[in-house]
């Protein structure tokens, strides 16, 4: 086996240099780093992590202890815990106890031997706190989940007593006479609290004629479920875990379907509905995040417990349709959100009997159709680009207050300024936010953190390789990562650039312009292109194009996919086009970071949803818009690859596990650039028209290598001609 001494000899450096390189220190030249890493690879050297941790005095290791990994409760907790911890550069070890207290005691010794800094545990030991403290862990090192311990300890859980009362209340509201209660071992305090609370609430009522109780382990759950059905024909079965509920469902559907049975259960959160189980939901993903956050930050100060508010019963109610023969026709821009919408509407059809027909159109074709046909569009609902909204809304949409006068009173829970930017026009509500989107900078975190590349960048520029805050920095880094200009770069292109359509080139210019100036027009409607801000933005646009692949991508989805293929260092994208970054074909999963765009003045994008003036089903169309704007539907849409305007979707732990940049994006909406264009005698100059004319001038100038002032003069002339047409 190769040693550090062997590596040093092959790389022709000192052993101290090898040690510095392996420990990620940046005080070594890029050439020596390259030689050391090549020797490491050629000789198959494996770093001794335990020895490395001993030298550092810390291991940055956390542990999660769970009974099993087939119950979604523990899967949700562990996945969120692990994602959070790994983003903080911690390693997470998983230990499975199979609900065996003796086996868990043995695992505790292994956990301690790994120099583990903190443990989150669903313990199987009745006095688990004592067992962990005896092994050498302090009160601060272990957080117990769901089940409180007899000793003073850190604890995260939910209100088991309240959950028992709420499920009992649900049972008493139903037409049930015979009820079965199936729980796990009552040696756990949380399960005992739930059981006692449920039964105490039930016995106070005379509505239930019989309650049959069974206690089971996971290993015996099938035979105990069978005992329930052979003892009685229950009207409802209550369980304290989703695993037991799914077992009840399986046994019932296969062997006892002669009589309807409702299954009511404590459950982790399901973003996508489960129709066969009535679920009282607990957010174990949030518990996982909170547990990891505590163990890393130790920020609880004078408290010992955190009680998570239960989400309660999942609410997917049936909607009473005014006419089950109705069909709603929807016209939509083709996008990932439209694909998600096609799936979500199946639930609406199931619950209402109303058929939904969605017609997709590409961006340019739909713009021409909507602009030319206006109110004559043969659709009930139109999903149009946010940029068209100020110009086309009044000719296409029925004001929603004409359909429901107090509609504004029911619009809550949206992202900051979403209603202002996506719904209101001249003081009236013409649409609901469809898919609010915002620009984010995405970059290859693995490359930005590579020790050799960081050193090489410093040697070239005498500056640290950091996430760019200006487009000058952005282009310097893009140049560095473009292999054509720097053969030390491991990838081909420094940045992406969407240049296939004039409108997208216009956006490339505008995002850079708005990093220098908040306004593109003066108070008289004159375009501010004869300015240093415009000249700087155009230079930066031309440079960025030079550091890109120069492939003429027609839309943001195409350039985002190029980034996902792994040959580009960074790019700026609207967040409604980037779900592919974590897709099965992505080569950058787990390798990306994200930040506010350079200049801290991002542009908005996305779509709005409105009721067509043509529609003969305006009431039903508005009901659909309100349904699609619900918190639960919004969260499901995002999880399926779309976007939502609801804050709850961005706060959902499962959504943030899937698309971890969304929590950050939510905070950026308040900084978004919205003052794009002026009013000319009461008529808006549409942003699409503005982007197109800018894009035509900029693209022509780049391709033909025109002088910067000449390009800007062309754009100003085109704008003045457009303004005259409006007048």
Provide a role label for each language-model segment:
Residues 122-162, 265-278:
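Flexible loop/hinge segments that line or gate small-molecule binding clefts
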Residues 329, 584-650, 674-680, 696-699, ...:
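Extracytoplasmic/periplasmic substrate-recognition and gating elements
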Residues 475-481, 512, 516-554:
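Glycine-centered hinge/linker elements that transmit conformational signals in sensory
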Residues 230-320, 324-325:
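Flexible loop/turn connectors
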């Amino acid at each position: 086996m190769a040693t550090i001494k062997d590596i040093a000899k092959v790389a022709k450096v000192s052993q101290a240099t090898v040690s510095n390189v392996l420990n990620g220190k940046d005080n070594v030249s890029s050439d020596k780093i390259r030689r050391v890493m090549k020797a490491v690879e050629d000789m198959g050297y494996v770093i001794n992590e335990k020895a490395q941790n001993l030298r550092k005095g810390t291991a940055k290791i956390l542990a999660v202890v769970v009974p099993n990994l087939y119950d979604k409760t523990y899967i949700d907790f562990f996945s969120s815990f692990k994602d959070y911890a790994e983003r903080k550069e911690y390693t997470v070890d998983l230990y499975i106890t199979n609900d065996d207290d003796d086996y868990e005691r043995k695992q505790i010794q292994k956990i301690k031997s790994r120099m583990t800094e903190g443990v989150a545990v669903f313990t199987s030991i009745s006095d688990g706190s004592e067992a962990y403290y005896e092994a050498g862990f302090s009160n601060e090192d272990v957080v117990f989940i769901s089940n409180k311990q007899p000793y003073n300890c850190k604890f995260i859980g939910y209100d088991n007593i309240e959950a028992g009362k709420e499920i009992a209340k649900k049972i008493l509201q139903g037409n049930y006479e015979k009820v079965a209660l199936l729980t796990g071992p009552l040696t756990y305090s949380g399960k005992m609290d739930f059981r006692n609370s449920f039964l105490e609430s039930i016995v106070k009522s005379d509505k239930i004629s019989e309650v049959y109780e069974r206690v089971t382990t996971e290993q015996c759950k099938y035979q105990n479920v069978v005992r329930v059905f052979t003892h009685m024909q229950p009207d409802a079965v209550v369980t304290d875990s989703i695993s037991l509920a799914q077992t009840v469902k399986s046994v019932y559907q296969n062997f006892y379907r002669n009589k309807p049975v409702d299954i009511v259960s404590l459950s982790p959160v399901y973003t996508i509905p489960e129709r066969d189980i009535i679920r009282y939901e607990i957010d174990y993903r949030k518990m996982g995040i909170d547990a990891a956050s505590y163990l890393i930050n130790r920020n609880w100060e004078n408290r010992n417990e955190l009680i998570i508010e239960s989400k309660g019963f999942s609410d997917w109610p049936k909607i009473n349709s005014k006419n089950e023969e109705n069909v709603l026709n929807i016209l939509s821009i083709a996008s990932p959100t439209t694909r998600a919408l096609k799936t979500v509407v199946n639930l609406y059809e199931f619950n209402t009997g109303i058929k939904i027909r969605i017609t997709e159109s590409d961006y340019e074709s739909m713009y021409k159709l909507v602009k030319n046909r206006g109110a004559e569009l043969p659709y009930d609902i139109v999903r149009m680009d946010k940029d068209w909204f100020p110009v086309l809304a009044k000719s296409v949409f029925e004001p929603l207050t004409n359909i429901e006068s107090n509609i504004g009173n029911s619009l809550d829970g949206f992202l900051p300024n979403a209603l202002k930017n996506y719904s209101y026009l001249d003081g009236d509500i013409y649409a609901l936010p469809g898919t609010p989107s915002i620009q984010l900078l995405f970059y290859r975190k693995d490359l930005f953190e590579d020790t050799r590349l960081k050193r090489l960048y410093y040697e070239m520029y005498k500056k640290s390789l950091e996430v760019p805050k200006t487009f000058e920095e952005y282009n310097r880094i893009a140049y560095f990562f473009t292999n054509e200009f720097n053969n030390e770069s491991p990838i081909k292109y420094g940045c992406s650039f969407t240049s296939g359509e004039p409108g997208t080139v216009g956006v490339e210019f505008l995002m850079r312009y708005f990093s220098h100036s908040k306004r593109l027009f003066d108070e008289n409607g004159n375009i501010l292109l004869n300015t240093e801000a415009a000249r700087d933005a155009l230079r930066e646009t031309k440079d960025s194009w030079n550091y890109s692949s120069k492939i003429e991508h027609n839309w943001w989805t195409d350039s985002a996919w190029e980034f996902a293929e792994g040959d580009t260092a960074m790019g700026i994208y609207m967040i409604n086009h980037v779900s592919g970054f974590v897709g099965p074909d992505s080569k950058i999963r787990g390798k990306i970071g994200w930040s506010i765009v350079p200049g801290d003045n991002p542009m908005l994008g996305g779509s709005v949803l409105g009721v067509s003036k043509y529609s003969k089903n305006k009431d039903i169309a508005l009901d659909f818009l309100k349904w699609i704007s619900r918190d639960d539907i919004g969260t499901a849409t995002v999880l399926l690859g779309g976007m939502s305007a609801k804050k709850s979707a961005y706060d959902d732990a499962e959504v943030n596990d899937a698309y971890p940049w969304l929590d950050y994006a939510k905070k950026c909406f308040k900084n978004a650039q919205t003052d794009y264009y002026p009013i000319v005698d009461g008529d808006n100059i549409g942003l699409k028209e503005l982007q197109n004319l800018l894009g035509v001038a900029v693209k022509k100038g780049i391709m033909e290598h025109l002088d910067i002032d000449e390009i800007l003069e062309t754009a100003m002339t085109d704008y003045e001609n457009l303004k005259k047409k409006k007048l």
